[in-house]
């Protein structure tokens, strides 16, 4: 079916416009049961993976996931997940995205993100391979992909950030990394590996994310280690 898939905790919903009036006349719940909590850590950003599954991120605990096309409930922990577009299957995926954004590179490596550091993790070991042997302990499923959290924004900090950073009570509670007006990632999100051809060739394969609190788009060049 042609349409769009929406993540709206506790549901994942399929919408379609079948008569061309630009209004959805089909609404079908594919899955339900996800945790509802802080918006930035809710289920988000479904992206088609290179294996034909749709991947989505979440920073909260999952829940007991049900759906009309599932054979039974699927227990989901605090982890990202992947699912079939027809709602026939859903399962955990390696890693847990800390905020909005899901990114794949050209060879299928998946990157996760947190508000305080870009490209926090690369995910070299897919969970669906590791689960085949229940008698073997699961190793660490993520690898740190960046070793910095400082920023160098071109624009001046928002006035409210300056005011907040001058409040000693706020600084004492949250610490310098969260209260300095500029200089640290505090809202990194919306990551993407550039894989198109509109930008110059030198941009291909580079990593981008934004930090709205600092009016900044960050670019990093990825180098494989090993």
Cite the ranges covered by each PLM segment:
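Beta-propeller domains with acidic blade repeats across secreted/periplasmic ectodomains
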Residues: 1-226
